[in-house]
Amino acid sequence: PTLSKNITVRKVKIINEGPNGDGCDPESCEDVLIEDCIFHTGDDCIAIKSGRNEDGRKWNIPSRNIIVRGCKMEDGHGGVVVGSEISGGVNNVFVENCEMDSPNLDRVLRIKTNNCRGGLTENIYMRNVKVGQCREAVLRINLCYEPKEAAKRGFNPTVRNVYMENVTCQKSRYGIL
């Protein structure tokens, strides 16, 4: 969904192993509930966005008040991802009571952005998440995503207030990267 409010995505099963095959991407949305869903994707299971570069800064509409709970995530580049198109900002994301497990799931929680995007990402909460295994990291914050992107630079992003509580992982290469 894009530019929407009061969204509920419940009991949806998404199987898409193709490239750029995200599961659910709320973009510049407010008051979103993603609940009891299953994601098996070739890209990000859930990717929260708010516009890319100049267009995102022009509209300046953040994604906010997003709850992800009771979901199962397999495969893909990230379980819950914020970005990379987050020029309008993202705030108040709550992830709880989810399960993730796959040797093909790269990351559990990922924030990706760069200085073409700018934007404020804040108040990201994850709790009570069980991870069997993931390939790379439980948490990855990448502030230099797509470093060769041909776009105007100088819009430094801000990421603050990222909290994780009772997130367990049996196997990953890194905890935080």
Question: Predicted regions span which residues?
Answer:
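Extracellular/periplasmic carbohydrate-active domains that bind, remodel
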Residues: 1-177
